[in-house]
């Protein structure tokens, strides 16, 4: 397949599928399943074609408007390819879970596929112009999926989601327009090279002036970029849109929001913010670490107070993504020794693993919530259940594995990323890491409470005939649970492929 534009095919394929789904009516889910299965196959193929040195491969580059710094430029390394695989898996899970879309199924599944295209484009684009187009392409269908198929309070939830994410997009756009005016380039690679040499800040200062309100212009641009990505992750205090959006969206849509879209923010920090604004982020490292720790601890404590399972898992997602932020901001420090370099590599490997593992586990948990809702007429409160391990032992067992993965139990996928993050972060930012352990303890209490209240104790009379998972549900969930176990036992399957990219990234970042 030498010379075949596989990344373009991967990105355009969902758009073709969306058109077909839109015209297919009640058969739209079948079209979406076939389309997403093809996407997963292509994403896995891309994963096998990565350069062994960790550089960006499968490059596709064509001039569009050179005078405006716009070119069609796609490529992937271990980070991008892993996010492609995650996006493909989560989208397939979401489509498979959406068994009860009776209102305009063609439009629903068409929007899901458009969102998938936006995800793939965001993880492969290497030029700001069309990266931003794909970034926004994921926002629009997500808004309508919440607005049209969400719960009773879907209107305010969708509006809040749109306003927050659009505000973040504006911050990104303004910052990059300033960078373009200073450099005449939107290419991430060229801009990263300028930043590594210290020339980017000089060009920005020459073009836009020394700064204002006591800060250099470059620092303000870094703040704008960080704010844009912080909304998407989300990072405290930009997280307030998330609980309503996650709880009001249909569970299959929530799977996409938490499993894939939230990773766009973390990916943006690694692909764009650190390479271009590493020096500025290092200068703001202490307050950023404070916000990361606040994200970890606040997410965990907020989850304790929730009675709605979707809101419990929503705040738990904030907590888990906070560990990614902890690892990222902890490593933003000049290397003073070989030990520091090893700690940076451990933290970054952990962040990338955590992105994948959280996406897989969180999507699975919201899928299980969808199953509970379908069997109880929409109930999803922690106190609405009890003793389900008796009438539904398979569901209890498989959901229990996903819950223990979220808890970070050794032997499951959720443990590995967090372990590597803390292994690296403790030597780079020991105070922040120590405080963040509180988040681990509180998360354990939350997960164990869910297990105890949902699966243990007496079975309420109305749940005595609660149906266990169907054969189809077991077949669909088995690969997901199997992957959790496989990564937990053999994490090197991912680490060995990602580590060259980690080494390559760290070698080019300047703090």
What is the predicted role of each segment?
Residues 93-99, 117-129, 142-453:
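Hydrophobic transmembrane alpha-helices and their helix-loop junctions in integral membrane proteins
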Residues 10-11, 137, 230-233, 239, ...:
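Hydrophobic alpha-helical transmembrane segments of integral membrane proteins
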Residues 34-49, 165-178, 441, 479-493:
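Hydrophobic alpha-helical membrane-insertion segments
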Residues 61-82, 126-134, 138-143, 407, ...:
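Membrane-interface helix-loop-helix modules in multi-pass inner-membrane proteins
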Residues 7-8, 28-33, 105-106, 129-133, ...:
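Short, aromatic-rich membrane-interface segments at the entry and exit
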Residues 8-22, 33-48, 84-98, 115-117, ...:
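Central hydrophobic cores of alpha-helical transmembrane segments in multi-pass inner-membrane proteins
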Residues 13, 193, 249, 378, ...:
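Cytoplasmic/organellar membrane-interface segments at the starts of transmembrane helices
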Residues 1-6, 20-112, 185-205, 504:
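Transmembrane helix-loop-helix hairpins at membrane boundaries of multipass inner-membrane proteins
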């Amino acid at each position: 397949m030498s010379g075949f534009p596989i990344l373009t095919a991967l990105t355009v394929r969902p758009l073709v599928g969306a058109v077909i789904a839109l015209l297919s009516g009640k058969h739209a889910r079948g079209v979406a399943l076939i389309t997403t299965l093809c996407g997963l196959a292509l994403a896995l193929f891309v994963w096998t074609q990565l350069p062994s040195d960790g550089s960006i491969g499968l490059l596709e580059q064509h001039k569009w408007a050179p005078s405006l710094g716009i070119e069609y430029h796609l490529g992937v390394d271990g980070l991008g390819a892993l996010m492609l695989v995650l996006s493909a898996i989560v989208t397939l899970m979401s489509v498979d879970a959406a068994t009860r879309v009776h209102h305009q199924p063609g439009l629903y599944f068409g929007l899901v596929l458009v969102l998938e295209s936006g995800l793939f484009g965001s993880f492969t684009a290497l030029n700001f112009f069309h990266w931003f187009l794909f970034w926004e392409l994921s926002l629009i269908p997500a808004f309508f999926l919440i607005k049209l198929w969400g719960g009773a309070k879907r209107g305010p939830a969708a509006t809040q989601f749109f306003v927050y994410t659009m505000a973040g997009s504006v911050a990104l756009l303004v910052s990059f327009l300033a960078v373009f005016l200073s450099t005449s380039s939107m290419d991430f690679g060229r801009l990263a090279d300028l930043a590594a040499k210290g020339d980017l800040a000089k060009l920005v200062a020459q073009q836009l002036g020394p700064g204002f309100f006591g800060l250099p212009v470059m620092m303000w641009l870094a703040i704008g970029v960080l704010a844009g990505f912080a909304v998407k992750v989300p990072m405290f205090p930009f997280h307030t849109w998330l609980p309503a959006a996650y709880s009001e969206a249909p569970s299959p849509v929530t799977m996409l929001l938490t499993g894939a879209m939230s990773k766009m923010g973390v990916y943006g920090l690694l692909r764009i913010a650190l390479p271009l604004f590493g020096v500025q982020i290092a200068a703001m490292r202490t307050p950023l670490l404070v916000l990361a720790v606040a994200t970890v601890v606040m997410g965990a404590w907020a989850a304790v107070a929730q009675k709605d399972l979707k809101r419990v898992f929503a705040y738990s997602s904030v907590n888990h993504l906070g560990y990614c932020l902890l690892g990222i901001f902890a490593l933003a420090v000049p290397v003073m020794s070989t030990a520091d370099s090893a700690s940076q590599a451990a933290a970054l490997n952990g962040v990338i693993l955590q992105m994948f593992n959280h996406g897989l586990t969180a999507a699975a948990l919201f899928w299980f919530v969808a199953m509970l809702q379908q069997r109880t007429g929409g109930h999803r409160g922690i106190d609405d259940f009890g003793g389900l391990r008796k009438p539904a032992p398979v569901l209890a067992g498989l959901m229990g594995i996903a819950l223990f993965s979220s808890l970070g139990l050794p032997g499951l996928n959720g443990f590995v990323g967090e372990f590597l993050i803390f292994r690296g972060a403790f030597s780079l930012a020991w105070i922040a890491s120590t405080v963040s352990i509180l988040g681990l303890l509180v998360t354990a209490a939350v997960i164990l409470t869910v297990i105890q209240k949902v699966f243990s104790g007496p079975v309420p009379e109305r749940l005595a005939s609660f149906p266990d998972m169907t054969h189809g549900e077991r077949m669909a969930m088995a690969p997901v649970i199997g992957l959790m176990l496989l990564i937990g036992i053999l994490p090197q399957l991912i680490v060995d492929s990602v580590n060259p990219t980690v080494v390559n990234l760290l070698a080019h970042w300047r703090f």
